[in-house]
Design a protein with these regions (language model features):
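N-terminal FAD cofactor-binding segment of flavoenzymes
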Residues: 21, 34-76
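C-terminal helical "tail/cap" subdomain of flavin- and related membrane-associated enzymes
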Residues: 301-438
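Glycine-rich phosphate/pyrophosphate-binding beta-alpha loops
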Residues: 43-46, 95, 203-205, 275-287
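N-terminal Rossmann-like FAD-binding beta1-loop-alpha1 element of flavoenzymes
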Residues: 2-31
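Predominantly flavin-linked oxidoreductase catalytic cores and closely associated redox partners
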Residues: 11, 111-242, 276
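Short beta-strand to alpha-helix junction loop
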Residues: 87-108, 158, 222-230
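FAD/FMN-dependent oxidoreductases across multiple families
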Residues: 122, 225-305, 312-328
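Conserved Rossmann-like nucleotide-cofactor binding loop
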Residues: 14, 37, 156
């Protein structure tokens, strides 16, 4: 039997980063993962990481010469469905190899005193005499006692889905709750792709990769990989991309649904993809998850002081900080985007043209949005159906933001808050509800 203060299930970006923060708080931390160290997170290779995140999360900036580093770029374009209107956003981005970036994070965790065990799969929770979570058992038969168990296992959410507690939702992340990501690594015939360009209507993009004469053509879609391929076909038939030769494909998944209303209960916390913490406009998860982890480390350390047990009351501040901050903004954005995509290509072009929902960094918010939309309907440039969809989504978005900003400061008021939140999200719907051609 092993004894630790904290055991984390999952050694990818969320679990490894959080383990380092906890170890720096003088906690004894073990991270387990079902994969071998050599095969960890090798499903996807290239990823993009916003450069301001290095300083925000106190990570040493990757640079030329580092094994994980590929290149930098500093402009992201987005284009309308009919390819008529371009928006420009200035974002400094690093292109990197994900497995090697995680290796870099793991090195820092080891230096901080974290212990890793690979090729170990979660089997079940163990409980103390007061029926409180008190560690885990692995499928190899290993017993690990720990006062706090953290689920960082990704979409399978192997620990969270086994918990029966009023402060923890145990839903499974199903086909309607995630984006299936299809990535084509291509060799370009003539042109070069040095910046990222996305077409939000198709949930498609073309972006830099590790080969200078190559690119990544990608799409994300709910329901299935087969439907993602159908969306890729539609994307490539609708948008004139540079001529290319396909080198190989990668596939993966990212959560795309609202996160649990609570991330903690007695002796337990959920983070990363297991908590559905991704950016609503592009599905990226690394910085979104770390925003939750960063303040949580000190709260956990305080709860574990003097051999204490981390009750839901002691961990509750983790919920409050996140849900009133990034949680409120992402929830509102997610609800708004459901309405913004539920329209035709022509409607999407109109929104781009008038800087409604989609705008460049140097464009101001359209001060006459309602007037512009109504005029568009009258002139048959924008459909009445799209107006109703967008207006309804904006109203629902504002209600959800307001509700999250009123997140309860203690577990005592959670049940009432959750009940209203469930009603608001039922009215908002999901991105998968908008699919009509599956």
């Amino acid at each position: 039997m092993l004894n630790f203060d904290v055991v984390i299930v999952g050694a990818c970006t969320a679990g490894t980063y959080f383990s380092t923060l906890l170890a720096k708080e003088n906690l004894k931390v073990l991270v387990i993962d079902k994969d071998t160290e050599e095969n960890l997170c090798k499903r996807l290779d290239i990823f993009h990481f916003t450069k301001d995140s290095y300083a925000q999360f106190n990570i040493e900036e990757s640079k030329e010469g580092d094994e994980e580093f590929v290149r930098d770029f500093n402009i992201c374009y987005s284009k309308s469905a009919l390819d008529n209107h371009l928006k420009t956003n200035y974002i400094d981005v690093s292109v990197m190899h994900l497995p090697l970036f995680i290796k870099k994070l793991r090195k820092k965790a080891l230096e901080a005193g974290v212990t890793f065990k690979f090729n170990e799969s979660f089997d079940s929770l163990i409980y103390n005499e007061d029926n409180q979570i008190n560690g885990i058992k692995t499928k190899s038969g290993l017993t690990i006692k720990a006062r706090l168990v953290v689920d960082a296992s990704g979409i399978p959410s192997v620990v969270r889905t086994t918990i029966n507690n009023p402060y923890m939702e145990n839903f499974k992340i199903g086909p309607k709750d995630m984006f299936y990501v299809l990535l084509k690594y291509v060799e370009l015939k003539d042109s070069k792709v040095e910046l990222s360009t996305s077409w939000p209507y198709y949930k498609g993009w073309i972006a830099p990769q590790h080969n200078s004469n190559g690119a990544i053509v990608g799409v994300g879609a709910n329901l299935s990989l087969e439907y993602a391929r159908k969306c890729m076909d539609k994307f490539e038939k609708s948008i004139k991309l540079p001529e290319y030769t396909l080198s190989y494909e990668e596939t993966g998944c990212t959560p795309y649904r609202r996160p649990p209303f609570s991330f903690v209960c007695d002796g337990f916390m959920v983070i990363g993809d297991a908590a559905c913490l991704t950016k609503p406009w592009n599905g990226e998860g690394i910085p979104a998850a770390w925003v939750q982890c960063t303040p949580a480390a000190k709260i956990v350390a305080k709860a574990l002081e003097n051999n204490g047990y981390p009750t839901v009351d002691l961990l509750w501040k983790i919920n409050e900080i996140y849900q009133k901050g990034e949680g409120a903004e992402y929830a509102a954005t997610r609800a708004m985007l459901i309405g913004a995509v539920n329209m035709s290509e022509k409607d999407n072009d109109f929104l781009f043209k008038h800087a409604i929902v989609f705008k460049s960094d140097d464009e101001l918010e359209n001060p006459h949005m309602i007037k512009t939309l109504l005029k568009g309907v009258l002139k048959k440039k924008f459909s009445l159906k799209a107006l109703i969809s967008l207006s309804s989504a904006l109203i629902k978005s504002n209600k959800i933001r307001k509700h999250y900003l009123n997140y309860p400061s203690s577990p005592n008021l959670y049940k009432k808050w959750k009940k209203k939140a469930e009603v608001l999200w039922k009215k908002a719907g999901t991105m998968a509800d908008c699919i009509k051609d599956a």
